[in-house]
Amino acid sequence: MERALLIIDGTVLVLRPWFAKVSAPWAVARNQLRKEAAKYTHVAVVIDRTMDTFRRKLDPRYKAHRPPASAELIAHFNRFEEEVTKMGIALFGSLEVEADDLAATLTRHAVAAGLPVLIQAPDKDLFQLIRDAAPSVRVIAPKKGWDINEAGVMERLGVTPSQVTDFQALVGDATDGVIGVAGVGAKTAAALLTARGTLDAIYADLDGLVTLPIRGAKTLPRKLLAGKDDAMLARRLVTLRADVDMGADPLAKCEMP
């Protein structure tokens, strides 16, 4: 077994076979979990229990376009949770935060304990947690062929992990209903952050942006000023919480038998 903490997004694990119209999504998810869990000394499953988290309170538009889960799907989630518990694998869920926040908090505990982390979830929001320095943190998604380190973040987004939240604040995230700055796309956002480093530094000198070798640079001060409130709110929405109360020594709960 590899000495590392594997964090699996259980919600995604159930949803994938559900959307594939498999007859028993919970069973497919359980079997996949069993296979992956056998490889690591520490394993945790994190799940979303509600969409009405603190982010929805910050912005009612957050994930507002997503329909509520059907009774049948909820039954599959419940059965999967029962199976996880039977397997003796740590399961974490919350009515206040999302699975990604639980993953971020577990990652903080693991890094502090010198334990490498692998987060299995096809979610760019998690890129902000990635680090190459020991103990490393990587985001993996076998179905997508992901095994992403710092270079992988740069390759995909054009920024470093520490810049991911500022990048998302600029471009937004239609998947989650996060509104960024209108007229600022991924390439422009990456170029701005490469030149200025942070979102705050960009806004500290809007007039100076016109001299940057970026296509449409002369229009950037106007666009960024108009979208400032959206960008600042977006940054709050996409920043993962790593301070969730998960009880005493949550890492100990993740130790595999």
What are these language model-derived features?
Residues 2, 36-40, 44, 133, ...:
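Non-catalytic nucleic-acid-binding/docking modules located in mid-to-C-terminal regions
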Residues 99, 125-126, 188, 198:
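Short phosphate-engaging motifs
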Residues 2-116, 120, 126-145, 231-233, ...:
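Noncatalytic, basic helical substrate-engagement surface that gates or grips nucleic-acid strands
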